[in-house]
Curated annotation (Swiss-Prot):
Protein name per UniProt: Glucosamine-6-phosphate deaminase
Organism name: Treponema denticola (strain ATCC 35405 / DSM 14222 / CIP 103919 / JCM 8153 / KCTC 15104)
Family statement drawn from the similarity comment of this UniProt entry: Belongs to the glucosamine/galactosamine-6-phosphate isomerase family. NagB subfamily.
Keywords annotated in UniProt: Allosteric enzyme, Carbohydrate metabolism, Hydrolase
Transmembrane residue ranges: none
The EC number(s) this enzyme carries: 3.5.99.6
Length: 270
């Protein structure tokens, strides 16, 4: 596992966007061999999406041969609902880049047969071989996507009941009304994420400090689903200073020292 520590959220966003940009460009994707990218929603990746849009508009990066799979979607919300993750992704990212609509994959929270929808999603991922890079964020309780505490670390895409904490946290997007927050969601599993060639997780702010501590210094446990990253051959957590508040001083020093040669991922393409 790599732990990248930056000064601020803005620095984390720029580093992450540069990293993704480099990966796509180095892959040299084509129609026959697209780059497959896993994506999250929420406030954490917004800065990354803005940076990637900027790179696209500057002619540095094209998404024409990029295929995306989103992590999750609320059950019961139409794609046109302002708080659906379909709407979020179109409004904050896809409408601003040159990605082919057919290459966008987001779970359908209105599917009549949710089990089949989840099984088909797994099949769609497998049809491309694998996800090359899965970007994600984590909750204060260490959940990735909607894999809440005590989720199986080998889980696949399925319907999950949201915890009380998650409903309270997400109510800020629903006029502060917890009753308006969907109680279940379709989500990729921890096993689905772990199958990716590479996993990159963003964690910023003091509220994520305990989750970062458990992910890096704690043992592997389904209580903190993010801890599964310890078993991944190529996982990265990028965080700001505030998110390291619960780490041991020697842990922070270790990662700062070992990453000195890797800390910058500047993109300079014309």
């Amino acid at each position: 596992m790599r732990l990248i520590i930056k000064n601020s959220y803005e620095d984390c966003s720029k580093w992450t966007a540069d990293y993704i940009c480099n990966k796509i460009i180095e892959f040299k994707p084509t129609k026959e061999k697209p780059f497959v990218l896993g994506l999250p929603t929420g406030s954490t990746p917004l800065g990354v999406y803005k940076e990637l849009i900027k790179k696209h508009k500057e002619g540095i990066l094209s998404f024409k041969h990029v295929v995306t799979f989103n992590m999750d979607e609320y059950v019961g919300l139409e794609a046109s609902h302002p708080q659906s993750y379909h709407y979020f992704m179109m409004d904050n990212f896809f409408n601003h880049i040159d990605i082919e609509p057919k290459n966008i994959h987001i779970l359908d929270g209105m599917a009549k047969d949710k089990k089949k929808e989840c099984e088909d999603y797994e099949k769609a991922i497998r049809s491309y071989g694998k996800i090359h890079l899965f970007l994600g964020g984590i909750g204060a309780d260490g959940h990735i996507a909607f894999n809440e505490p005590y989720s199986s670390l080998t889980s696949r895409t399925r319907e999950k009941t949201l915890t009380r904490d998650t409903i309270i946290m997400n109510s800020r997007f629903f006029e502060g009304n917890e009753d308006l927050v969907p109680k279940t969601a379709l989500t990729v599993g921890i096993g689905t994420i772990m199958d990716a060639e590479e996993v990159l997780i963003m964690a910023t702010g003091h509220a994520k400090a305990e989750a970062v501590h458990q992910a890096v210094e704690g043992g592997v446990s389904h209580v903190w689903t993010v801890s599964a990253l310890q078993l991944h051959p190529k996982s990265i957590i990028i965080c700001d200073d505030a998110a390291t508040d619960e780490l041991k001083v020697k842990t922070v020093k270790y990662f700062l020292d070992i990453e000195k040669g890797n800390i910058e991922t500047n993109v300079s393409r014309k």
